């Protein structure tokens, strides 16, 4: 579903936001701010520090559009979107590493790409056979047959989403899911990545986002491709964007952006590829770079 299909009141709301942003942002060297969350926007406690929050609110007041771009599910991003008042200022949520875009000003889905239906039972049977936990998302809940798995609990903690135990995961997933997550000990996830990539790699992407997390997502989705869709919607170009990240899944958007900023705590390859390296996520690195490059 695309944003052009909004009901008229929502179209009017978005148009009003766009006009206000256009009036305010003329002096900004970068008019869209794309932010990874974990290890970038948030500190080790998974919270936004007061300094970083203050600078991002000020940037939005001056017309900047904030995009929260994460591998998290939509409802795992919502608390941070609300904290930064993206609903008031017309920001966007980019969830599942780009698999879904939500206009948080109107709370309407702009874009979604789904897992191929034929792959889902294959993944499910593989997890059952190997004894790995497999989870999906239903509204604001994590659904799984293994709620006591420590890595399932970690996904719950990161996203601040409750876990619901189900007897058959396939019966409780959202229609047309965008992502499944398999969890297990790091050595077993290496094997699972290799085996599932060989079996399903022509249909979908399989990769580890952490040693114990195996992501199963639509093929060809990344943050840069979804940001290009979003930039076209708001009539901006990559040159208008400053992007922040720390992980390998952030590289595509750092390369796309007019200014790609890596955190000091980023992986060495990410720092080497960035246009600029700021302070760490424990030192208000996002705020420091925005003050430098946006003159706010």
Language-model features: where?
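Non-catalytic pre-domain segments flanking phosphatase-related domains
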Residues: 1-37, 54-57, 61
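Mg2+-dependent phosphoryl-transfer enzymes with acidic/Ser/Thr/Gly-rich catalytic loops
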Residues: 23-32, 49, 215-296
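Residue-level signal for inorganic ion chemistry
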Residues: 39, 59, 70, 97, ...
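Active-site phosphate-binding/coordination module
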Residues: 50-151
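Hydrophobic packing residues within well-ordered alpha-helices of enzyme cores
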Residues: 52, 77-81, 192, 196, ...
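Short active-site oxyanion
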Residues: 63-67, 89-91, 179, 239-241, ...
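Short, structured coil segments at secondary-structure junctions
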Residues: 84, 89, 97, 200-202, ...
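Conserved acidic, metal-coordinating active-site core of Asp-based
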Residues: 126-244, 248
């Amino acid at each position: 579903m695309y944003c052009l299909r909004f009901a008229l009141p929502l179209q009017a709301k978005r148009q009003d936001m766009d006009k206000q942003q256009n009036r305010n942002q003329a002096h900004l060297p970068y008019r869209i701010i794309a932010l990874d969350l974990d290890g970038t926007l948030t500190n080790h406690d998974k919270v936004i520090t007061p300094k970083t929050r203050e600078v991002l609110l000020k940037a939005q007041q001056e017309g900047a559009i904030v995009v929260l771009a994460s591998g998290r599910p939509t409802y795992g991003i919502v608390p941070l979107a609300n904290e930064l008042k993206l609903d008031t200022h017309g920001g966007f949520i980019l969830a599942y590493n780009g698999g879904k875009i939500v206009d948080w000003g109107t709370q309407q889905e702009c874009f979604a790409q789904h897992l191929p239906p034929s792959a889902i039972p294959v993944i499910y049977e593989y997890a059952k056979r190997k004894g790995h936990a497999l989870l999906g998302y239903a509204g604001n809940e994590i659904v799984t047959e293994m709620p006591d798995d420590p890595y399932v609990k970690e996904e719950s903690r990161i996203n601040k989403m409750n876990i619901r135990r189900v007897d058959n995961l396939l019966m409780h997933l959202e229609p047309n899911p965008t992502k499944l997550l398999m969890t297990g000990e790091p050595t077993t996830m290496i094997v699972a990545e290799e085996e599932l990539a060989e079996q399903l790699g022509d249909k979908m992407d399989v990769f580890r986002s952490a040693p114990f997390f195996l992501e199963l997502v639509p093929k060809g989705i990344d943050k840069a491709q979804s940001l290009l869709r979003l930039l076209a919607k708001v009539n901006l170009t990559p040159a208008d964007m400053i992007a922040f990240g720390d992980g390998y899944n952030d590289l595509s958007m750092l390369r796309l952006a007019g200014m790609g900023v890596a955190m000091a705590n980023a992986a060495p390859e990410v720092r080497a590829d960035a246009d600029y390296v700021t302070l760490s996520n424990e030192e208000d690195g996002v705020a420091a770079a925005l003050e430098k490059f946006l003159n706010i």
